[in-house]
Design a protein with these regions (language model features):
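A conserved loop-to-beta-strand element in the N-lobe of protein kinase catalytic cores
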Residues: 167-194, 202-203
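Protein kinase glycine-rich loop
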Residues: 95-106
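A short, aromatic-enriched beta-strand patch in the conserved N-lobe beta-sheet
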Residues: 161-162
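Conserved catalytic-loop aspartate of Hanks-type protein kinases
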Residues: 298
Length: 399
């Protein structure tokens, strides 16, 4: 009996151990499921990861491959996505040079049957501009294009298109071979606009320095410029570099505003627009003084241009930048209005170049003031060789 009882006790103990083992396996499996293990055939003892066993280098390689594929896909999307102002350079035929500028060359050409001017800009050509400076200039160019391509007005140069690259652009070589062409650097950009055969207003005025302009022509040019600026301001655009050099004439002497290199959408907060932007002699006092400014800086510059159109002369030809800056801001220096200038026109000049921006008229008001001027009785300056000693004539000071 004792032997039989002992065997039964031993069997019960084995059964209990077996049950305990099964329960442990059940708990372990439940924990494995709860942890969401992805190790597959790994045993329970290997559920804990050891940092010294992890191959971080392999992870880096895989991550780099993944990012490279993602970047390549993104670049493919970007390369196929074109801005609405981008043009097909294959349709552009460049003929010859029109002018040289600070950062590039202007060519005459043909785009899809239209007579055009092509401005090719290469900011790294001099080897001085750093990569950061070149990037900033390219961004500025893109801003110019973004402003220009939306404009449509008879007194604003018509924008045709632009390209942030010039890899497909062929420029005739200076060599004698008619088949020889040059390709600008890939970093270069180009903008294409309508070709205006009359050249710049600046050159037109220089050609008329001695004989001057008829009063009717003075008012016509002034109205063209004022209407163009009024349109820009209605679109919340401040040109910021209004000068006769940035105005072009077509075959019928209609004036059109050009060069939006420093134009920008007007900030709602004037303090967001600061810094010296413009050209010596045309810059408003608040701009010269580094103060916040708005569209009224264009009104000031227009006043200087109006004087220049009437006189066919240039303001402050004998003063340095520092002298002009100081005198305009602190001494209220302005060009001297000839005594023979009609009071109606002289009044517009003075209103436009008032030291207080808030007192300057809006450009649409300037348009109305100019339209009200009677040109039937003359009023322009007499040619210099016909001067009879009138105090309104001064010796020519050159272009």
């Amino acid at each position: 009996m004792e032997s039989s009882n002992g065997k039964e006790a031993e069997g019960a103990m084995k059964e209990e151990k077996s049950n305990t083992h099964q329960e442990a396996e059940t708990v372990s499996n439940a924990e494995e499921t709860k942890l969401g293990s992805k190790v597959g055939s790994m045993s329970n003892k290997e559920m804990y990861f050891r940092a010294d066993k992890i191959d971080f280098k392999s992870w880096d390689v895989q991550l780099e491959k993944h990012l490279s594929r993602a970047w390549s896909r993104d670049m493919e999307v970007q390369s196929t996505r074109k801005e609405e102002w981008e043009i097909d350079l294959g349709k552009l035929d460049i003929r010859h040079v029109i002018a040289y500028g600070t950062y590039g060359v202007v060519y005459r050409g043909n785009y899809d049957g239209q007579d055009v001017a092509v401005k090719v800009l290469d900011w790294g050509e001099d080897g001085i501009a750093t990569a950061a400076e070149t990037a900033a200039l390219r961004a500025s160019f893109k801003q110019e294009v973004a402003v220009w391509h939306k404009l449509d007005h008879p007194n604003v140069t018509k924008f045709v298109g632009a390209s942030m690259g010039t890899s497909n652009l062929k420029i005739p070589s200076k060599s004698s071979s008619s088949d020889s062409v040059n390709s600008p650097p890939s970093r270069a950009c180009c903008v294409v606009v309508e070709y205006l055969p009359g050249g710049t207003l600046k050159k037109f005025l220089i050609r008329n320095t001695r004989k001057k302009l008829a009063f009717k022509i003075v008012i016509q040019l002034a109205l063209d410029l004022s209407r163009g600026l009024s349109y820009l301001h209605s679109k919340k655009i401040v040109h910021r570099d209004v000068k006769t050099e940035n105005m072009l004439l077509d075959a019928t002497r209609t004036l059109k505003i050009a060069d939006f290199g420093v134009a920008r959408v007007e900030a709602q907060n004037p303090r967001d627009m600061t810094g010296e932007t413009g050209t010596l002699g045309y810059m408003a006092p608040e701009v010269l003084d580094g103060k916040p400014y708005n569209r009224k800086c264009d009104v000031y510059s227009f006043g200087i241009c109006l004087w220049e159109i009437y006189c066919c002369d240039m303001p402050y030809p004998d003063l340095s930048f520092a002298e002009v800056s100081s005198a305009v801001v602190r001494q209220h220096l302005r060009p001297e209005i000839p005594r023979c200038c009609p009071s109606s026109l002289a009044s517009v000049m003075r209103k436009c170049w008032d030291a207080n921006p808030e007192k300057r008229p809006e450009m649409d008001e300037v348009v109305r003031l100019l339209e009200a001027i009677d040109t039937s009785k003359g009023g322009g300056m007499l040619p210099e060789d016909q001067s009879t000693g009138c105090l309104c004539f001064t010796p020519a000071r050159g272009p």
